[in-house]
From Swiss-Prot:
Residues 529-538 have a biased composition (Acidic residues). It holds the Pfam family EF-hand_7. GO terms for cellular component: mitochondrion. Residues 88-120, 519-538 are annotated as: Disordered. The gene is B''ALPHA. This is Serine/threonine protein phosphatase 2A regulatory subunit B''alpha. GO terms for molecular function: calcium ion binding. Residues 177-212, 264-299, 390-425 form the EF-hand domain. It comes from Arabidopsis thaliana (Mouse-ear cress). Ca(2+) binds at D403, D405, D407, E414. Disruption phenotype: No visible phenotype. Residues 107-117 have a biased composition (Polar residues).
Length: 538
């Protein structure tokens, strides 16, 4: 609305604000009279000019000051206000006072006589430090200067830049990252593929790109992921494993066997995704990477020459066990196994019903493109779940198998369905059978579920004995070992309390496989070998 600021009215007519004389009581009982008075005041030309002036100041972003505009308005209005209450007994108090008040003066106007807009002071604005950074928090000044100083020292002898084989010292000493990430980081900076990383290019990526201020997990995550992706795929880890195989002294013996190098890299990646990718999507998020222990394992493997001492993910012995167990089951060596192959696992330890559930792809969809066949990756997930039932990924894997109707709980009927085959197998080998009613009581005593008639996944995760439940239901050999309290297993647990079930299994299996390989080498050896005395292993 356009406010007319013309000068047609030079003098304020006090009669415009005249109302009949009212007593204070009458005014209190009739509040609409005060509203009418305010409406009349708004209609005055002087008021219009004041409002227009304030609007113009606001539009022009200039400080709002109404002292000039309202001085004459105050005077004119002040002379008119007493006539409103001509017949009242006692004049009401006014914030502007009366003409006779010593506070009222043309020459000097106190703050209380000015516009209410002026009297309300704006609170001082407090400077809130920036807490969101679209590209990450920039590094502190001292950290930035320290990093640049180190970079200058490294590049002082390489004015034209560093080649890939010269870049490893930057990765390890400046970036504080595992050395086998060097080639991936190099290519991340050298986007044009020149084969050289200059000082300015490194500063732009590592310092100006705020990589310096990130935690190690975020740094590795951003180095490995593809542009535009918010997750890590299996292929993103392949260059890292390739460099590890090329540079790590503990894997040097594999350099002449590229096939086994490839299998080792695949197995490590499968183990990483089995434990880290808890959502099962095949894509590792930054949150999952931070929650897992992969970063610690990567740092450890970079410092340890003996790869087998890094039992998380990278142990060659663990790879050897997984690969050899798969190879034993894969009779035709087409790198695929079927139900009949898997039923032989662990000396026919598993029941047909649980194998059917696995091949129904209930716990996990197969990556194999051949129907009814399990690939090496699928087997890696299976063996990790079977031999480490105390881990959460394993509990989730087997819980899906036992939960026949997929309602999120395991009922006594579902447990009985799987235990029936166990009971039949015990009868076949003349083993004294254990009735299901007794087993059910034992299971509920071990788990102590929140509800009496069913078991949830959370109930299993809260109990340290959960793995035994699945052994009771579908693994006869482990069930018998649990019932007899195998002294060998008990002694092994006491000797290495920090090891997981998988670690102990891999340790035993590697010894067994090594002994079998030694025997095979002896049997295929020369006549000279047969002449040497052999000590009995027992």
């Amino acid at each position: 609305m356009e406010i007319d600021g013309g000068n047609d009215v030079q003098i304020l007519d006090p009669e415009l604000l005249q109302l009949p004389g009212l007593s204070p009581v009458s005014l209190k009982e009739n509040p609409h009279i005060a509203e009418e008075l305010f409406s009349q005041w708004l209609s005055l030309p002087e008021t219009g000019r004041l409002v227009k002036s304030l609007i113009d100041d606001t539009k022009s972003s200039t400080p709002v000051s109404v002292s000039k505009n309202c001085t004459s308005l105050n005077v004119a209005c002040g002379s008119a206000l007493p006539s409103v209450f001509l017949n009242s007994g006692t004049p009401p108090l006014s914030p502007r006072g009366s003409p006779g008040s010593p506070r009222f003066s043309r020459q000097k106007t106190s703050p209380s006589l000015q516009s209410p807009l002026k009297s309300v002071r704006e609170p001082k604005r407090q400077l809130i430090p920036q807490f969101y950074f679209q590209h990450g928090r920039p590094p502190a000044k001292e950290l930035r200067e320290q990093c640049i100083s180190m970079v200058d020292q490294f590049f002082s002898n390489y004015i034209d830049g560093l080649h890939m084989d010269e870049f490893k010292s930057i990765t390890k000493e400046v970036c504080k990252l595992p050395s086998f990430l060097s080639s991936v980081l190099f290519r991340k900076i050298d986007t044009s593929g020149t084969g050289i990383v200059t000082r300015d290019a490194f500063i732009k990526y590592w310092v100006d790109g705020h990589m310096l201020a990130m935690d190690v997990a975020s740094q590795i995550y951003n180095i490995l992921r593809q542009p535009g992706c918010k997750y890590l795929r299996q292929a993103d880890f392949k260059p890292v494993l390739d460099e590890l195989l090329t540079t790590h002294p503990g894997l040097e013996f594999l350099r002449n066997t590229p096939e086994f190098q490839e299998r080792y890299a695949e197995t490590v990646i499968y183990r990483i995704f089995y434990y880290i990718n808890r959502s099962g999507t095949g894509c590792i998020t930054l949150r999952e990477l931070k929650r897992g222990n992969l970063i610690t394992a990567m740092q450890q493997v970079d410092e340890e020459d003996d790869i087998n001492k890094v039992i998380r993910y990278f142990s060659y012995e663990h790879f050897y066990v997984i690969y050899c167990r798969f190879w034993e089951l894969d009779g035709d060596h087409d790198f695929l196994i079927d139900k009949e192959n898997l039923i032989k696992y662990g000396n026919h330890a598993l029941t047909y019903r649980i194998v059917d559930r696995i091949f129904s792809q209930v716990p996990r969809k197969f990556t194999s493109k051949v129907e009814g066949k399990m690939s090496y990756e699928d087997f890696a997930y299976f063996i990790l779940a079977e031999e480490d039932k105390s881990s959460e990924p394993s509990l989730e894997y087997w819980f899906k198998c036992i939960d026949l109707d997929g309602d999120g709980v395991i009922t006594p009927n579902e447990m009985q369905f799987f235990y029936e085959e166990q009971l039949h197998r015990m009868e076949c080998i003349t083993q004294e059978p254990v009735l299901f009613e007794d087993i059910l009581c034992q299971i509920f005593d071990m788990i102590k579920p929140e509800k009496e008639n069913c078991i949830t996944l959370q109930d299993l995760k809260a109990s340290k004995l959960s793995g035994n439940i699945f052994n009771i239901l579908f693994n006869l050999n482990k069930f018998m070992a649990f019932e007899t309290r195998d002294p060998f297993l008990i002694r092994q647990e006491r000797e290495n309390p920090t090891l997981t079930e998988w670690d102990r299994f891999a340790q035993r299996e590697y010894v067994r496989l090594s002994m079998e390989e030694d025997v095979e080498e002896v049997s295929n050896g020369s006549a000279d070998v047969w002449d040497e005395p052999l000590e009995s292993p027992f």
